[in-house]
């Protein structure tokens, strides 16, 4: 109760509703009816704290005031990056960035008259910069938070932060780009985001949010969805990239395959130098060998401009300022010269494109062939290619009679295109619809693949992996191009087959999380985050006593054993 008004509630706690959206509405009604300035929602697993600013908006706060504190002390408190780590709503309250964005949409964005994707992207961009600066200067205070300013003062501060971020990471937003949210709407969004830590070891925090934003726009129309990070990690473990590998993702989405390849190689570099392993997606400064690898060896391409900007952001930050993510149509390479001559395109992408051109074979300059060691991709598999100018560039564009077809599945052309990106002995991991592996009509495709490379493995993914976007059954194909030294041609050889047994998501597309069998509570990783339950590779979680508990080896570990037994070149 309010100490100055003993009969008036000071804090109301809502315990009943299992979903935050339902419970928050109930909480609002109670607070509005009683005038209580603080509301708390919890379902026993998650908890959220709110300050009732007016009947229509409840501002998230970090906690309820202690007996010696006022509400204003909580609202106006200054925070360092270390303070943020302690109150992070994602690890402490088990919230997701996606759910917080949905909350912002309900509160203000739906009626703000702005492009939600662009405005949230700007805020995430500015907040990532703020976290980077404050992690590297432990005495600095975070600016991305409402510390008692007026709404207009707050907007001026956040716009300045965004402008500084644009200078640090060029080519994502134009110099003229401004935050378009009104001061009052921006204040709501800042309050919602200020107590979460975006820098996260596995990128899930940011990735999940961008997938949600883009799935509402054009992504689903072409059958292209961000690949879950646990599928990416399995592919990286099985393809085992090394510091000398040239790596590309030809349909990069948010660039998970390349970023996680970077993390894996960085671990190898640090282990070889006797340095602490470090984390993946952090603001920590990188040693020269790490940034040189990103600058010279890692590339990504996508046809969607928004997707490319997301991918470039994550690559720039993960790579400490380095990125070779390019906005191009991978399949339509005959038009690359025309596109790359455009001034605006050149300003952003020219440095990366010059490096890509150097990876063509000697004497080749039409972008049809490259010399990469590793291609990993999840190409769009909905919609056919119908342009004759594209189809005529591919052998798989012909039918069984050797004549060009009027339309060809997009993923089919990606198979051939990806193989043409590889040098002899190069390897590929590609996500494909299950039908390509067993449809009688696709026999010619399978024969084409077998003629050009050794089929290393096929891993069947669970039907729920790409839900809620699609329930299409998919598998990952792993191959290595024939080469006299790295992969001598054989007529008969063993192939590794495996099928994912744990679905990782339920039928609605919600992630299924690992449970600690000793406590019956959700298992957490060393960052206090929930762990998706799957069997693609070996999982571990932190026990109550602070020790790490390793679970059974998964598919990736079984393949590594197979690869060593077979003497595959990239596991020697």
List where the protein language model places each region.
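A short, conserved, highly charged catalytic patch centered on acidic carboxylates
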Residues: 1-38, 46-84
């Amino acid at each position: 109760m309010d100490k100055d008004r003993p009969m008036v509630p000071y804090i109301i706690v809502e315990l009943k509703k299992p979903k935050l959206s339902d419970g928050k509405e109930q909480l609002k009604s109670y607070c509005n009816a009683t005038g209580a300035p603080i509301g708390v929602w919890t379902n026993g697993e998650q908890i959220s704290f709110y300050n009732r600013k007016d009947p229509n908006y409840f501002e998230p706060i970090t906690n309820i005031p202690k007996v010696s504190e006022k509400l204003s002390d909580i609202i106006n408190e200054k925070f360092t990056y270390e303070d943020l780590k302690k109150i992070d709503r994602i690890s402490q309250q088990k919230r997701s960035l996606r759910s917080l964005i949905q909350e912002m949409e309900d509160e203000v964005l739906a009626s703000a008259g702005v492009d939600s994707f662009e405005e949230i992207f700007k805020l995430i961009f500015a907040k990532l910069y703020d976290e980077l600066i404050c992690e590297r200067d432990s005495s600095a205070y975070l600016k991305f938070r409402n510390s008692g300013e007026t709404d207009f003062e707050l907007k001026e501060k956040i716009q300045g932060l965004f402008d500084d971020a644009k200078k640090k990471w060029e080519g994502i937003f134009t110099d003229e780009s401004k935050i378009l949210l009104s001061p009052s709407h921006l204040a709501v969004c800042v309050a919602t985001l200020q107590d979460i830590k975006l820098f996260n070891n596995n990128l899930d925090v940011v990735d999940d949010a961008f997938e949600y934003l883009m799935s509402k726009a054009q992504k689903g129309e072409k059958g292209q969805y961000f690949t879950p990070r646990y599928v990416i990690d399995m592919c990286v473990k099985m393809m085992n990239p090394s510091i000398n590998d040239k790596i590309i993702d030809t349909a990069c989405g948010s660039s998970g395959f390349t970023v996680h390849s970077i993390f894996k190689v960085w671990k190898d570099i640090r282990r070889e130098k006797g340095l602490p392993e470090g984390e993946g997606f952090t603001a920590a400064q990188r040693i020269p060998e790490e940034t040189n690898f990103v600058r010279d060896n890692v590339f990504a391409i996508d046809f969607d401009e928004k997707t490319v900007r997301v991918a470039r952001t994550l690559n720039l930050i993960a790579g400490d300022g380095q990125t070779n993510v390019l906005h191009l149509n991978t399949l339509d390479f005959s038009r690359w010269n025309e596109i790359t001559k455009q001034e605006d395109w050149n300003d952003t992408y020219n440095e990366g494109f010059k490096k890509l051109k150097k990876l063509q074979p000697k004497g080749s300059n039409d972008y049809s062939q490259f010399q990469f060691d590793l291609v990993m991709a999840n190409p769009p598999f909905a919609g056919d290619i119908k342009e004759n100018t594209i189809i005529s560039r591919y052998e798989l564009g012909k039918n069984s009679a050797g004549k060009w077809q009027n339309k060809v599945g997009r993923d089919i052309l990606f198979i051939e295109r990806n193989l043409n990106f590889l040098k002899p002995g190069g390897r590929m991991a590609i996500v494909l619809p299950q039908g390509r592996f067993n449809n009688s009509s696709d026999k010619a495709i399978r024969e084409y693949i077998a003629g050009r490379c050794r089929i290393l493995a096929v891993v069947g993914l669970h039907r729920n992996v790409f839900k809620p976007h699609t329930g299409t059954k998919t598998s990952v194909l792993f191959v290595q191009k024939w080469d006299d030294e790295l992969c001598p041609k054989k007529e008969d050889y063993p192939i590794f087959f495996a099928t994912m047994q744990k679905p990782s998501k339920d039928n609605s597309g919600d992630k299924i999380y690992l449970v600690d069998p000793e406590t019956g509570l959700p298992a957490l990783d060393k960052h206090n985050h929930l762990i998706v339950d799957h069997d693609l590779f070996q999982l571990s979680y932190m026990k109550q006593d602070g020790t790490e508990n390793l679970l059974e080896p998964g598919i990736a570990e079984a393949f590594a054993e197979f690869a060593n037994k077979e003497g595959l070149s990239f596991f020697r």
